[in-house]
């Protein structure tokens, strides 16, 4: 409730608010002229004669300690109870208040305060008689009326249903009643039977539930075993893949090894180890030049290395054939290889030289080269024993220490260095290497092709 004061007219304006939307209300002018009779009619609760009898109402009021009330019968069958004015005026209310302000005289202020108090008490009584708090604005009242209309329609429909049921019951005779009793007994028996079936079903349900728990436990165990088997399978699968990779790797290695083996089988050890060729006027073995020219002074270390490879080649060919040389024994010793005389073992014939003045006066180097030529001749003769068609391109004269160019110029070239030119000595060495190359080819064809 709100209040405002106007100082010119010395009047007080008081307004109430809606109990739902809290909007300020402007009361109707009829609230200003309320008399006691009107107030009693507005605040009296509505009861029908069927719901409450006068005697019972009076007895209840007497027992409850309430003040007596006046019941006024009406033509519409509704009794109205009126609360005595003295009680209403003395009721303490939540809307009660004391008006303090200025007025033209004391009587007017007292009348205004009394009227507002009566109005507030009236709203409290109306709120106590119903489930709705008062006052309400017009919109909230319309909403409330719509709700009450809905409840009224529902209640009327229920009432109509009850009336129809009552009419049906009143129209039924005794036979129908007995028949209904029999049906009721049958339904009771059916209910007992269904209850028994329900109990049996409940027992079966418990049994099925127990079986279900067992099956679920078994299923869980099987799931665990399946997971374990899956893990083992995955591990075995991984191992299988690793073994497959290893197998493929081994197979690849075997194929590669087989290819290498086939290649090695086709490879001639002598041809691969001893490569005899020529470089200009020089005969070469494993890229070492054998001989020297005035225009090309080959180092003696290279010549000695070439002689070492040559001795090693003839020694290997003889061992392959099982040939043992007469008069001399080959001793491969790198660039210090030599021949050992079988008649005089203390005599060594070196196939190496350092040059200088000593080279011209010491003839051991020449004797060693002639002895080596003798060994080549023995190798040729050994081959001819088994292969009569075998022939070397250059004929060798061991006694003179010369090699003849039978297929070319027909000249003879000494293998010695003393009293010989470097050109002829180099050519003789070249022809000797050519004969060894032919011997190498024959040995390869006889032993390795088989």
UniProtKB/Swiss-Prot annotation:
Phosphothreonine: modified positions: 119
Modified residues (Phosphoserine): 15, 30, 90, 93, 96
Span list, region Disordered: 48-72
N-terminal signal peptide: none
Location of region: Required for membrane-association: 425-450
Region (Interaction with BCL2 and BCL2L1): 112-159
Major location category of this protein: cytoplasm
N-acetylmethionine modifications at: 1
One annotated GO molecular function: protein-macromolecule adaptor activity
Ranges for region Evolutionary conserved domain (ECD): 245-450
Membrane topology label: Peripheral membrane protein
A cellular component term, taken from the record's GO annotations: endosome membrane
Keyword ATP-binding: no
UniProt keyword terms in alphabetical order: Acetylation, Antiviral defense, Apoptosis, Autophagy, Cell cycle, Cell division, Coiled coil, Cytoplasm, Cytoplasmic vesicle, Endoplasmic reticulum, Endosome, Golgi apparatus, Isopeptide bond, Membrane, Mitochondrion, Nucleus, Phosphoprotein, Ubl conjugation
Family annotation (Pfam families): APG6, APG6_N, BH3
Glycyl lysine isopeptide (Lys-Gly) (interchain with G-Cter in ubiquitin) cross-link, renumbered residues: 402, 437
GO BP term, pick one: apoptotic process
Quaternary assembly: A homodimeric form is proposed to exist; this metastable form readily transits to ATG14- or UVRAG-containing complexes with BECN1:UVRAG being more stable than BECN1:ATG14. Component of the PI3K (PI3KC3/PI3K-III/class III phosphatidylinositol 3-kinase) complex the core of which is composed of the catalytic subunit PIK3C3, the regulatory subunit PIK3R4 and BECN1 associating with additional regulatory/auxiliary subunits to form alternative complex forms.
Family: Belongs to the beclin family.
Domain notes per entry: The C-terminal evolutionary conserved domain (ECD) contains poly-Gln-binding domains such as the ATXN3 poly-Gln motif, consistent with structural docking models revealing two highly scored poly-Gln-binding pockets in the ECD. As some binding is observed with BECN1 lacking the ECD, other domains of BECN1 may also interact with ATXN3.
UniProt name for this protein: Beclin-1
Organism of origin: Pongo abelii
Gene name of the encoded protein: BECN1
